């Protein structure tokens, strides 16, 4: 074992114990289903802001964006306004309103909110939303577990199967114990580690090249197109790429594991304060990723896998103990998303199906037990998926973000801002968003025309509007 791997092992064991300790503490405060799924609507500004943003990004924030910037150069900057636009939509137009309305109609999950808003006594909206959430989340979690297995393998040299099992059981441990309270607290810590790692490594990269001015000169010499705003592309190719990158932001309003975090906020002041914390976190994460990717053209020319740039730069530029902490940040990015997604997937079974659709009348403690059991079984199922055939999973996860974003994003916005939205319009919107995402991806239009989320989001919105107009006489008053 090398000095670095030995220190990383020690740091990880400490990290492992802290995560489980948080789960145990949170479990002692979990007394009802509302506690388990929404932390009794008690989350404060810093936890709400950073946990929601960290859980939305996964390893893409610390590996994918750095790799994209390395490959595309300065032209990759167009994903920054796209992502920040998503943050702005969520925090300025959704967070405060959905927290207030979800509390008024006693909604615990996103499916709850949609069904109760339209007073859908036939449970059609709940069933559709459960199918979409469950199918996307399970594939998403399976893919994330595969990623965490590869990360363990690369850092510790642990076999792939054992890596997935260790990483998966750690996440399941604290998620089962403390529910969303444990998930939010751990996501908060993991989000801080993520931003610390990216900021430190990017600044050290600039310093190693002699400062910003010297860095720009060296990058220009190493790769002249890296600092071009259009990345050397034709106007048509650049426009298509820019629209796709900007379109990423359309996915944020429809992510259930993010939206439910707003529902768990303590009050409206938490949302107002959290807005600026979340925007600051996002700006630091993505600007640092772009900066590091550009520096990578000089530090690691001809890198075979651009997504390896972040850990390679950390190992080369930082002292060994700090490198260990930064590499744990990669695991943190993945784990923060897995825990949130597995909890949302579990809520579709334990709360939406078992408690609501099957009408099982149980005590609070019994429902919590069923919820924890569901987390365990779904988590084990995701681990088995990750251990099996992964090519299908990774293909599916490419449009899982789009599928969730297009299915729920437009509908959430319509329910909050247009009173004429009907139950039939909601059904049409969710169905259209998911199907268009799937068809667009399968037919290859995402590569040849534009990112699938853009047309799927637009067509879902149109479906909600026109079907609602045609069925406006059937609008029901929301439950309270």
Which residues make up each language-model segment?
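Membrane-embedded helix-loop-helix hairpins and adjacent transmembrane boundary segments
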Residues: 1-480
């Amino acid at each position: 074992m090398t000095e670095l791997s030995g220190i990383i092992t020690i740091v990880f064991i400490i990290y492992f114990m802290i995560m489980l300790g948080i789960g145990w503490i949170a479990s002692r405060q979990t007394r009802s289903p509302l506690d388990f799924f929404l932390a009794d609507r008690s989350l404060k500004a810093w936890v709400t802001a950073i946990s929601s943003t960290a859980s939305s990004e996964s390893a893409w924030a610390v590996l994918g964006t750095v790799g994209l910037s390395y490959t595309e150069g300065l032209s990759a900057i167009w994903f920054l306004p796209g992502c920040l636009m998503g943050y702005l939509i969520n925090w300025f137009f959704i967070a405060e309103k959905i927290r207030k309305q979800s509390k008024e109609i006693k909604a615990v999950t996103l499916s709850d909110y949609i069904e109760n808003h339209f007073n859908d006594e036939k449970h059609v909206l709940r069933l559709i939303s459960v199918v979409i959430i469950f199918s996307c989340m399970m594939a998403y979690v399976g893919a994330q577990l595969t990623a965490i297995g590869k990360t363990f393998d690369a850092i510790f040299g642990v076999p792939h199967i054992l890596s997935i099992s260790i990483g998966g059981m750690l996440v399941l441990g604290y998620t089962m114990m403390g529910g969303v309270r444990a998930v939010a607290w751990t996501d908060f810590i993991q989000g801080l580690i993520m931003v610390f790692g990216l900021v430190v490594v990017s600044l050290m990269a600039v310093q190693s090249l002699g400062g910003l001015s010297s860095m720009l000169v060296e990058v220009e010499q190493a790769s002249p197109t890296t600092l071009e705003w259009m990345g050397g592309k034709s106007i048509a190719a650049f426009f298509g790429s820019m629209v796709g990158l900007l379109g990423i932001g359309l996915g944020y309003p429809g992510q259930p594991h993010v939206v439910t975090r707003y529902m768990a906020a303590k009050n409206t002041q938490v949302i107002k304060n959290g807005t600026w914390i979340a925007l600051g976190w996002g700006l630091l994460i993505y600007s640092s990723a772009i900066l590091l990717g550009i520096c990578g053209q000089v530090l690691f020319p001809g890198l075979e896998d651009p997504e390896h740039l972040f850990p390679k730069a950390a190992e080369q530029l930082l002292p060994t103990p700090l490198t260990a902490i930064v590499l744990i940040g990669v695991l943190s990015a993945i784990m923060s998303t897995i825990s949130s997604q597995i909890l949302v997937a579990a809520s579709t079974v334990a709360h939406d199906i078992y408690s609501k659709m099957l009408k099982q009348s149980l005590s609070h403690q019994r429902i919590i037990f069923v919820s924890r059991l569901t987390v365990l079984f779904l988590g084990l199922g995701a681990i088995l998926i990750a251990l099996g055939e992964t090519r299908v999973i990774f293909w599916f996860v490419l449009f899982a973000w789009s599928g969730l974003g297009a299915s729920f994003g437009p509908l959430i916005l319509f329910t909050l801002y247009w009173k004429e939205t009907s139950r039939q319009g909601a059904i049409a919107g969710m169905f259209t968003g998911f199907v268009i995402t799937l068809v667009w991806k399968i037919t290859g239009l995402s590569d040849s025309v534009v990112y699938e989320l853009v047309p799927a989001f637009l067509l879902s919105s149109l479906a909600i509007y026109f079907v609602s107009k045609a069925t406006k006489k059937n609008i029901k008053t929301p439950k309270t």
